[in-house]
Amino acid sequence: QALRPAAAEPEVATAMPELASDGELLVELNQETDAERWKRWIGAQGWTTRRAFYPADGQRTDLDDYYLVDVPADQVAELVALMAMLEATGMTDNVEPNEVIRLEFDPARTVPKSNKQLGVDDPRVNEQWAMTALEMDRFYTLLTSEQVKPQKRALVAILDTGVDAKHEDLAANFFSVNKKFDDDPQGHGTHCAGIAGAVTNNGVGVASFARSGDFFRVTSVKVLRAGGSGTQQDIINGIITAVDRGADVLSLSLGGFSTQSRQQAYSEAVRYATDKGAIVVAAAGNSNRDAATYTPVNATGMIGVSAVDDQLQRAVFSNKVNRIEMALAAPGVGIFSTKPNNNYEAHNGTSMATPFVSGLLGVMKSIRPSLTNKEAFKILQETGINTRETSNTGKLIQPARAVGALIGAAAN
């Protein structure tokens, strides 16, 4: 299944989303089926197959049992029947379409201003209304106090279109896991990276959760192409790469409508990440529909993020998260952040809300490296505040209160 960045887009209303052109199906083999038997059977149908994923720690996951199947173009129209046929072979545990959804980017037309003094010298901070809504002045005061000490320098991975690693307001807080991920021809990933981890109090650009570089750095794992599209295989490989390279928090500002009620492959990928100590966060989506029909936010173990505006109303585009097991809200309208080539712009979307949560989680994982996704969500939910539509947004994160609860819990 393939996804796009979750900048605000119109509702997708299509019975069968576009499929990957080079591997239309993702198939999990059962334990009784060896690869050679599978390949012989696929070859007899006139199809081709290849392994989909290569996790470093294969003993922890079933992801290494997944194969891509290339279906001839003249048979793609019969995909539902082909999936049923594969399920009836006795060789598979799971069959899913490898869907593609394309990016539609939404710049913000207006940016609410903030007059509150936050105690940092970033010159564009007055264009970041979200910092006031999140009481970031209290958060910065807490981070610079003697009460809060990082136990490690955490790593927040932005799984997206790439990140401009040379940006003036990102470079000092950026860690590269692979140079091929460190540019961003699209701009979406760089915007998300700045929300989570732009260098703060450096006299340049914008502020973020990186008040001090001691707590976390950001990195990039490129999972979306320059045109803004990527397959389910791309996203899952990105999750594997990020975790295998040591990421503590994975931020997925992407997603799309899915025909699959069971997100088995995505859920297995999230389980692989959480078993290795990481927390995975995903955008709720921007179609003003039920986020339970949107992937990968509907995968088991994922923390989902909805978007609110400066009045703490659910953003008109934000999906409703009442059926997502772990869901939170963050600002997602008129969000001002970094863009490639030392630029800055405002955008709308649950894409923008997601890295607010990811950046905060980066700080929390730094303070308590053993923090799990469920423990983190419990703290963020209990310390969050109501929006004007909490049942459909989840609680709005409050960073200072969350860190205060974390260190209080640690002290106990």
PLM segments and residue spans:
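Active-site-proximal beta-strand/loop segments in catalytic clefts of secreted hydrolases
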Residues: 29-30, 97-100, 158-162, 196-199, ...
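Subtilisin-like serine protease catalytic core
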Residues: 140-175, 182-232, 298-301, 311-313, ...
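Primarily auto-inhibitory N-terminal propeptides
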Residues: 1-114
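Loop/turn elements at helix/coil->beta-strand transitions in domains of secreted/extracellular proteins
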Residues: 91-93, 152-155, 214-217, 244-250, ...
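Substrate-binding/charge-relay-adjacent region of secreted/lumenal peptidase catalytic domains
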Residues: 194-197, 229-252
